[in-house]
Swiss-Prot record:
It comes from Homo sapiens. The gene is FAM227A. Residues 345-362 have a biased composition (Polar residues). Keywords: Phosphoprotein. Residues 87-99, 363-374, 540-562 have a biased composition (Basic and acidic residues). This is Protein FAM227A.
């Protein structure tokens, strides 16, 4: 038996069973915690694996219990939940303590930044048809308290998403304390505003119901007024109230993304609708256009972010392979050119031996300096301390930030600012509604209006950016360069053909000249073989005058007579 135990230990170490998580909507911290829990369960109940000789295998099979028993191993997450629930029931002392603890923990989300969703995983297996926002069936309106988030999504998990999204990626700090932000969002009034705003936007977009939406808006106004009228307020609460529209926009967005992971919410229309609604309800003004571009979507929409990150990583791998091949070819083509460049100064300095020795000394000194600096740098790196966790996190955040392309501005004229009247005292629709319906005092005083120029319209998404213009310009330049190279090659082929044709003509001409030259030499040689007659030159002057008067015909006859030999004389 000890031998089999050793074999089980060997199986665990050599063939570990790694659990695979298919629910990408859960945060990374939650997934890591779930993996640790399942691994602990596997260590406590190791799987049986038959490894060894045939004798050991047969002995192991003989020792197997063949009786039918129900499966002893359950899901690790379900078992952990059952044990945790039983432990809570044992520790509770009385019903009064139970009620007190329920009241105290009703709106508490301690440790939500590191919290992971366990129960939602089990419920989502049977609620796949409701993962689309368009097909979800809304339950009845609860007038006593806000309805919970759909599909078993825990509210504290959403609080953790917003808290992590408010953290600066490089410094890792919030605009206020993380605990203060967590405590504020999990308190009763912001929680009610959050949930009712979620359901109001859900009904506004997918299932319009004016009566139900009016009830939701009424409760939102009451909780917002209660939040403002509560005194005293700390400095952090004042800062949180100023950023409340942005916080609620992120909260509603991450709730939609996590509750309905099969729907697509990464659109300009949906995000601008959420931001405009929250800002108009609370402050009465529109937010800056496209303020959602600076959100941390790795925390607000983790499933889509991981998918895009994986696709981008694959594109980078393919581009890196192409670039490595291109760089290798380029380096191979540059090697002979570099050798030729290095050869010229040697040939030019061959005539002066003094210059050659001085250059050799300089090269040796430079090499010694380079070696010394390299040694010093190596010693410094050994002496330096290891980077801390914060430095590693900042470097990872910068790498992640550099992985995604930076946003480029639109290559067009910015939209004109519009003039709107703004009330200095503020006119929040929620407060106005609360005062009109629940306040006993009438509004007094006057409105002080000023002209406020704001940017209400944004450039359309189809507008090309400077990056697009630069890429199109580079593509056109590359295309023109290719066309020029093709024209250059065509030009050289035509010139080569023309040179070849001229060479053929010249060869034919030289061949014909070689055939003509012997014939001319033979005729010239034949002409020199004949002796010219002397009697022709001693003719009388009367005959010459007659010949001159006789015309060109007789002259030609006399010229012909010079070429005939004089055979006989009378």
């Amino acid at each position: 038996m000890n031998h089999f135990r050793k074999m089980e230990v060997i199986n665990l170490t050599t063939l570990p069973m790694i659990p695979v998580d298919e629910h990408l909507a859960v945060s990374l911290v939650a997934r890591n915690t779930m993996v640790k829990t399942v691994r602990k369960e596997l260590e406590n109940n190791p799987p049986s694996c038959l490894i060894g000789s045939m004798h050991q295998v047969n002995q192991k099979i003989a020792d197997i219990n063949l009786r039918t028993e129900p499966s002893a191993n359950s899901l690790a997450i379900e078992r952990f939940e059952l044990e945790k629930k039983a432990l809570r029931e044992k520790t509770r002392s009385s019903p009064e303590d139970k009620v007190k603890r329920q009241r105290k923990s009703q709106y508490s989300c301690k440790g939500s930044e590191l919290r992971h969703a366990r129960s939602s995983v089990i419920k989502r297996k049977t609620a796949d048809k409701n993962l689309l926002a368009e097909l979800y069936q809304y339950s009845n309106f609860n007038s006593s308290k806000p309805n919970k988030l759909p599909n078993g999504v825990d509210f504290c998990d959403m609080v953790g998403n917003v808290v992590r999204a408010e953290r600066d990626c490089l410094s890792g700090k919030h605009f206020c304390s993380g605990r203060e932000l967590e405590k504020f969002l999990s308190s009763s009034s912001p929680r009610a505003i959050w949930l009712d705003s979620f359901w109001w936007i859900f009904h506004e977009r997918y299932q319009p119901n004016k009566e139900l939406q009016n009830n939701l808006f009424d409760r939102i106004a009451q909780h917002y007024a209660l939040l403002l009228f509560r005194v005293p307020k700390s400095h952090s609460e004042e800062a949180l109230l100023k950023r409340l529209p942005s916080l609620l926009s992120k909260a509603v967005y991450t709730s939609f993304c996590c509750c309905f992971p099969q729907s697509w919410f990464d659109t300009h229309e949906f995000k601008s609708d959420i931001c405009n609604t929250m800002s108009l309800w609370i402050s009465g003004t529109y937010p800056s256009p496209q303020s959602y571009d600076s959100w941390d979507y790795s925390e607000l929409d983790p499933e889509r972010f991981r998918r895009e990150e994986l696709m981008l990583y694959r594109r980078r791998l393919t581009k890196g392979r192409e670039f490595s091949l291109f760089a290798g070819k380029r380096a191979f083509s540059q090697k002979p050119a570099q050798s030729r460049k290095f050869y010229h100064p040697q040939s030019s300095s061959a005539n002066s031996p003094s210059e050659k020795t001085s250059s050799a000394k300089q090269n040796s000194e430079k090499s010694l300096r380079m070696q010394n600096t390299a040694k010093e740098h190596h010693c410094q790196t050994l002496v330096l301390k290891k980077p801390t966790q914060e430095v590693k996190r900042i470097s990872e955040a910068r790498e992640c930030e550099n992985m995604f392309p930076k946003k480029s501005c639109a290559a067009c004229k910015s939209p004109e600012l519009t003039s709107n009247l703004f009330n200095i005292y503020g006119k929040s629709p929620l407060i106005v509604y609360f005062l009109q319906n629940y306040a006993s005092l009438q509004q007094h005083g006057k409105n002080v209006l000023i002209v406020r120029r704001e940017k209400t319209t944004s450039t359309p998404d189809c507008t090309p950016t400077y990056t697009d213009v630069i890429s199109e310009t580079l593509c056109s330049m590359k295309k023109r360069k290719d066309n020029l190279n093709q024209l250059y090659q065509h030009h050289w082929t035509e010139w080569n053909y023309f040179d070849k044709h001229l060479k053929e003509l010249q060869d034919n001409f030289s061949r014909e000249m070689k055939n003509i030259d012997p014939k001319a030499a033979d005729t010239k040689k034949a002409n020199h073989m004949f002796i010219p007659p002397s009697a022709v030159n001693e003719e009388s002057p009367d005959k010459k005058t007659k010949e001159g008067k006789g015309g060109e015909g007789k002259r030609r006859e006399t010229e012909v007579e010079h070429f005939f030999p004089l055979t006989s004389k009378p």
